[in-house]
Every structure is written in structure tokens, then in C-alpha cells.
């Protein structure tokens, strides 16, 4: 959920730039950590980043691969919650997942270390490049972001641009991992 949602919605290292939550009433200023990439650096953990509402087939395949993998696995899913404040309510949850992926806010991928034994790249990027013209619209659809626009419009504009730039850089980085030469740094 990109925050500590089980204790009331406090900012965490998983909170994104410009997100308004407890302890970040003026919008979080720094990028979120990438738990998926942290896990990939170990080289022996199966890692998947999914969003059921965006790509059910990728999610189901990742879950099956994670279960079959003979070592530790982690699946990180984009899961809107009430604290996100999705416009139209939680009945729009599946559609919000799709919007997150289409805009480039959330990327779908897997890292399957078992593929290395077959001489294959363990990293698979399922997401296409985000439709960056939809990015700000996506942020505005969740009150965890839109609240900042109402309270501090200039700050919101700057932080949301920074958020989008981070998303573009993240996707560029992920595309480099598709190259077999680039992924070698993922193993210790």
C-alpha cells in the first residue's frame, strides 16, 4: 500500500514522492525504496512485482512460479486501499491497478534465479513504457496525492514532476536489466 496502512497510514520508506500521509502532511520528498530490487541483489530469491487488475495472466504465472521455486520467494503487488482514496471508492480498485501500470507508476516484472542455471536472464520485464501523458492524471485520481494539490499547489506540482521523473528513471533502469550483460550485477 506504500505506507503503514495497518497502523493508520503513516509514511514509510515505501511511500512515494508527493504522497500525503501521517508524518508527511506536506508530501513526502524522497523516492521510495525498491523492495523488489533489494531482494534481487541477493541473487537467489524469486521476486515478482504484480498487479492483478492490470495483468491477471502475469500475476497468476508469477504466483505459480514463486510457489514452485525451491527457495525464498516474494511477490509485491500493487494493492490500492482505502487510505489511497481512489476516486469512486474501492469498487474501482481493479481499474486503478490497470491505470497504475498503464501510466508507468507501477511496473510488472519477475526475477527467477532458476533461469540462470539454464543460461537465461532471470529478469523478465512485462510492463511496456508508461503513458507519461497519463501519469499526472493517475496521481490526481488518488486523494493521497490530490490533497497536496489543494493545500500546496506549487509544491504539489514540483513533487509530482519529481515523482514522474523517478518513474521514468525506474523504467529505464528496469529495461537495462533485460540485457544479459546488465543483470550480472544482481548476484553477489
How should each PLM-predicted stretch be described?
Residues 59-155, 162, 175:
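Glycine/aspartate-rich loop-and-adjacent alpha/beta segment that forms the canonical ThDP
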Residues 19, 23, 31, 46-47, ...:
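Generic preference for well-ordered secondary structure
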Residues 184-188:
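Conserved small/polar residues in nucleotide/adenosyl-binding loops
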Residues 171-182:
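Short, amphipathic C-terminal "tail helix"
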Residues 165-169:
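A short structural micro-motif
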